[in-house]
């Protein structure tokens, strides 16, 4: 239930709200049979459901902290659920989590030193040092990495980055668009420690500015993955991100940054995947920060480090840097103080003792390595297991308000909305929690007047073509009135008493005398009840798109009756329920037979009979293949053409052909056989699809990839009898008897 996108120019909050509205509409259509979407923009004079009711229900579906945009790289954004393939995988995860807990206890059990034997207080030499005194067209002449010249690339023309007087020699002033990149510095993973230090000057109170990142190009917060140092509303945010906002650790300074003066900024990350491992320092002293996120679930992509700019995002406009340094370790507070020339002995004793433990206590260092390895092991196991979307309540979710005219960016702050439901339908039980669990219990409360009626009415429509409410998508004031209200009430009550047993209700309907009566109407019934609203005859139902396809596969003997498994492409011989569907881009054949595009909830399908449907049945390769396979099947089961055609009709229509139908099909067979016999000596006849032989040189299909087409037109039948039989089978598949249930 999401309508997210990563299209350029999309607004995250707009699509987040659209997704919430879609969930409300889907739930109201599906379970209540109401068009609540009508109340999204404003109240209606005679409609008991108000705009506040809509957004109160929206609060139930908007209580998760989500980003409205998907990752450009197609990753599943948290919160998600891992789909373990076996109990062994699930048990292994529990064991790995227990190993982490044990390692954390072992680390905590190591005593803090009683005295601060600081050892060396100066940090090791940085992995990268950029004095930024001299620039050339390809980079900085004096960039050093591990004592050697560093590979250094400019992301702009030579004149875009300006040299400016720095703390030591020259620094660089950024214009918001230009920056530079360190393509070889990629030790920026979730478990890799990092320290960034530089003299920095903020030239303005930036609403948003990227100082440092390894996220690659930027399509929105939901796609930013990697390390990120960002100015936001004059404050500094330091983050390690998998996918924002639900898989990231991030902190932000409590105070705004000082402007128009040089300061030494240091940002450290210890590789723990926890917000407690992030620290920010200004002039050697730790800055007070607030935790923004503390839920890093998976690894980030390992992109190169970029400074001062980011594609499709705001760069460090009017900001300056000098003496940029990078370490592949998290410096301690003592080492950061030493960078700024502060005597470590003036620091609080707790800070000194922490440094002594991390730098001189070998037992602590070994315990830390074991803990990090346990975390890596768990992450590797979890990332090997498929994930799928889930919803989870978050205290960080935005508060819900009535939106003026339903527009995402116009909340009416005078009209806050608590999670709730339309009380005009049924009052909320205050004993229940105000969340989706409470909603589920509200919907399934035996006293709720709608849910059971909507479900039974939909089952009735499935069996009889029309519901007892013909407008099964709308049981409200604007919908049709029930033709048999007492019957609907009785079935709804029995449905609840029977434990909401769908199979039992369907069995009851199809075993009823109403369903089993003839679908051929009398003249009087046709005149009085042409639409069969009063059920004077049995139902006449046109098969759905999925039924038509599955019926052809079953009759051909090619249907794979395996239950469960991954989705497959439409050319595979699996039931249609397993066919891969892409929202907004469903298989064309399904659309032609009235299947929905799945962009929005479709509580009731159209029921059409168009020439395009006949063309699909006669010419689509899948149906042609089915016709050929049926012909091959019946040619082995019988020898007489009349018997063969009878068998084909039974396989497809599940009944014997009437005499008139059989006569017509036999005539068609005789006629086509004669014509094809005349063509056979000089021209190919009907193509026969055969299973392609495996290519011994072809590589095995990678696990999880799309299935290859199972068959192609590989040979031509020169047998006029078999070709004519194929055409007859194709005609049967396209006949009204095959696609209509009576």
What are these regions (language model features)?
Residues 123-155, 162, 173-239, 259-262, ...:
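Extracellular glycan-recognition modules
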Residues 87, 93-177, 186, 215-222, ...:
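Extracytoplasmic low-complexity segments
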